[in-house]
């Protein structure tokens, strides 16, 4: 495909137009009085959202240079969302301000590499300042305030705080769509996975269609069980112990399954057969998690263990196993605390080293099942459009709350960034580096100005007042009052604030040092095809 090349000012201005087109669409959502954006979908109802990254992903521009400019800012929003789960609009607003100021200074003759070094040093200083100023999240109320601001709804914040209180900071909080109106919270203690019993005959409560095994043995097998002779020696030992047995295997079929069902119906022996969750390596890992949680071992040929020779010492144990047709919950496994902690550390290390969002999410789920618990927030709404928007807001707020617990909180409303300008007094920079640092100083006011604009206030006046207020004092845009924002429960996770600044400055610095852009040349539209195939004189 033919390429088109632009140089110097033309290249940078083309990129800036794309950046501005995207940023202008995103920044209207910032703050408590920010508006929503409607996104058209090719199929189904349109989506209404105030999430910066969702809006950014939908924007495709026609001009090749503008398209690249927009893609660069999309990267800022996406990276901030990946790291912190929120702050995508703030990151976009900061990137726009940094690029605008940077290009203005370059037009006045500043050297782009000097500006880049100055921007990097200034951002490093501001990041250190923010981390130092951050307050640890110690109370349920602080989590509720942080999540409530992210979701724009205090009720959602309180529900998330309650969920985190119950499952701990390592626990998984999932959001599901509900058929009923409003919000509900469901909590699960122990390990739950999405596989139920293989046959309904295993149910101990026919009305509720669930099997409940108290003080049960748990047999974990990595392969299929089909012949009863493999299982018989172990079954006899379990029957003698008088305890029920839960079998979790790749599958249980044939005469092995028939024998278990017949014994269950006759009341000879209480058992339940369950398919292991997941596939391939993930299934092996989850079985190993269960083994560590219950104090048993996975019977697998890979480690030289077989069913025929297995004894009771290889079985896991749990206070209770609850199985329905769709899911299984293991409560209070008998595994040793040290082994569980070791496994948790191992999974945490895998999360750190993984570069796949999907893998990270699955590892996080495994971690929660071992270390904390699972909370499910069920959200309902009057229409499908509202339901999607609400679910998205809750998911963002959950990630926001987790970020707050991780690194602490700073004053919200853009105040923490605007007041970080004081660190520039300690930076001894000269020439273009000092100019680069000043670009950052000016850009730090951009979020508070945009919040003021969206609230119908004068941005310059608000920014000036916030900048010169005591640390932590700023504008509560919802009420129009200047107050101690942390005391008023208006806070942002420092992880979100610093990620927004770091990612915005990274792209802005690259933007300013760009001297040429190579893009695909737009193809000329071909002549319309004659539907008659060139055959004239056709009458209908």
Swiss-Prot record:
CDD domains: GroEL
Protein name, per record: Chaperonin GroEL
InterPro entries hit by this protein: Chaperonin_Cpn60_CS (IPR018370), Cpn60/GroEL (IPR001844), Cpn60/GroEL/TCP-1 (IPR002423), GroEL-like_apical_dom_sf (IPR027409), GROEL-like_equatorial_sf (IPR027413), TCP-1-like_intermed_sf (IPR027410)
One GO cellular component term noted in the UniProt record for this chain: cytoplasm
Residue numbers binding ATP: 29-32, 86-90, 413, 476-478, 492
Keyword flag ATP-binding: yes
GO molecular function, a single term: isomerase activity
Role according to the record: Together with its co-chaperonin GroES, plays an essential role in assisting protein folding. The GroEL-GroES system forms a nano-cage that allows encapsulation of the non-native substrate proteins and provides a physical environment optimized to promote and accelerate protein folding.
UniProt keyword Isomerase, yes or no: yes
PANTHER family associated with the record: 60 KDA HEAT SHOCK PROTEIN, MITOCHONDRIAL
Keyword entries, A-Z: ATP-binding, Chaperone, Cytoplasm, Isomerase, Nucleotide-binding
Origin species: Tsukamurella paurometabola (Corynebacterium paurometabolum)
Gene: groEL
GO aspect biological process, one term: protein refolding
Known partners and oligomeric status: Forms a cylinder of 14 subunits composed of two heptameric rings stacked back-to-back. Interacts with the co-chaperonin GroES.
EC number(s) stated in the UniProt entry for this protein: 5.6.1.7
Compartments reported by the entry: Cytoplasm
Family statement: Belongs to the chaperonin (HSP60) family.
